[in-house]
Amino acid sequence: MVKSTIEESVATGRRKQAVSSVRLRPGTGKIDVNGKAFDEYFPLEIQRATILSPLKVLGHTEEFDLIIRINGGGIQGQVIATRLGLARALLKKNGDSKQELKSRGFLTRDPRKKERKKYGHKKARKSFQFSKR
């Protein structure tokens, strides 16, 4: 197998059912998400700002190219999973930035998941309508 000469760091982020793999390599700021342009996959500005916030905090907005692969979940779960993956990739690249990223909550994995449905209930906690007679 041929070793690549490009220095790249790869990290994974998860949120609910969304799993995001982020490849960070030196470049000009080009971002590719599942083969689409960044603003095509994430049309809302707030989503793009949330994902790029770890880069903005460290001041590396135009220094890296990102290749992002996302599976599962909804849009918001994918956004948070990608942000976590990006923060972890930046941490691999530069270990000095851990305190800055951790204090802003970028390295924290949100453990909440969908609660399972219980038998005898309509949903996880919602019951069927009660009838006294």
UniProtKB/Swiss-Prot annotation:
Residues 114-133 have a biased composition (Basic residues). Residues 95-113 have a biased composition (Basic and acidic residues). One of its GO terms (biological process) is translation. Residues 95-133 are annotated as: Disordered. It comes from the Bacteria. Keywords: Ribonucleoprotein, Ribosomal protein. One of its GO terms (cellular component) is cytosolic small ribosomal subunit. Gene3D superfamilies: 3.30.230.10. The keyword Ribosomal protein applies. Pfam families: Ribosomal_S9. Disulfide bonds: none annotated. GO terms for molecular function: RNA binding; structural constituent of ribosome. NCBIfam families: PRK00132.1 (NF001099). Belongs to the universal ribosomal protein uS9 family. This is Small ribosomal subunit protein uS9. The gene is rpsI.
